[in-house]
Amino acid sequence: MSKENSGEERALSKNCMDIGFFTRHIDKALEFWREELGLPFEEPVKFNGGLTQYRHALGDSVIKINTSDRDIGSSPCGYQELYIADDNTEAPVSTTDPDGNIVTRVPTGHLGIQGLGIKVASPNLETQRHFYTNVMGFKDLGSHKFAAGNTILLVEQNNK
């Protein structure tokens, strides 16, 4: 049984999304996000079980880089690309972080992105649309693009 969002309430606690991922290359990852991309950061947060989170600000969003003292294995995620809007960027410029994630700086407003954009792969576009709009309450912008507050989600077909 699913609970659908009435549209009156948002599934977000703030007007944007955060994104997080695990890394096995924390020193290289921190250098990438702090030095190469220049994102401001906070002191790391330690959790039970040997988990540590490094938080980097991206407007109102937070990039959460997580590490573990234990083997975390590898499991695929649906994130395909992270977009960062930048007033000083004239055309999209892609790079890859130390974990192989594609990170693209885009001009502010490119694809409707004002801060954070996330490209997501889904095996079923209609199911993903239903989940984002009817369950999460995100705004359908057409062409498989959704607004989660001021975060833009771009969904593409994944036939794997």
Label each residue range with its predicted role.
Residues 1-43, 54-160:
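Glyoxalase I/VOC metalloenzyme domain signal
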